[in-house]
Amino acid sequence: MKRAIVIGATSGIGRALAERLAAEGYRVGVTGRREALLEELAASRPGSFCYAAADIMDPAAACAALERLAGELGGMDLCVGSAGTGDLNPGLDYALEEPAIRTNVVGWTAAVDWAYGRFEERGGGHLVVITSVGGLRGGGAAPAYNASKAYQINYAEGLRQRAAKSGLPLPVTDIRPGFVATEMAKGEGLFWVMPVDRVVEGIVRAIRRRRSVAVVTRRWRLPAWLIRHMPECIYRKMG
């Protein structure tokens, strides 16, 4: 039986992906802030899940929880970093920016480094990170969120390069969703908001194919390309 750990599995993409992996025969370790939701997930398919609650904004506690899960699973073949947060911040209030920085940068880095280290010890595996199309450019509505996702995209590329240089058989898959119908989708008039199940289908496809980068769903590929290559003089007027 294959073993996976999903970081940030209490809701949204992380939870739906954990459920899908369990349905496909994985034994899945899940972690997140809200223990009651993790317990509910574990009870939904007895024997398929183990869980450890931890707040990723406390990197030491989060990594200790991941270590417990890996021990209970007897190792891991796949690790998915899905924890993330972000708020619209029209007033540029630092109190709204700090959770995104502590979650998407500080805690995320600790968790991803932990996973990379375990795969390095094991001699391989598969690391998947959920970034965002939002990380392709800065965003005036939520500056810290966009910046943190750009950080994740570049960090994942760095790990991919590191693995290749050392000869470690470790695909690092960067999943870049557009707008998804989860608690994270904030703001009025968002276009092409995708249902979670379709996003998960795209993620599973990318995992199977061991893709380096996957924009999900496919309809977001052209918008992502346009966002990335749009002249700055045009892009700055869009926020």
Describe each model-derived feature in a short phrase:
Residues 10-11:
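Conserved glycine-rich cofactor-binding loop
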Residues 45-60:
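Rossmann-fold cofactor-recognition segment
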Residues 80-88:
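Conserved NAD(P)H cofactor-binding loop of Rossmann-fold oxidoreductase domains
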Residues 89-102:
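Short alpha-helical oligomerization interface
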Residues 112, 148:
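Active-site helix of classical SDR
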Residues 132:
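Residue(s) in the substrate-gating loop at a strand-loop-helix junction
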Residues 174, 186-225:
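C-terminal helical subdomain
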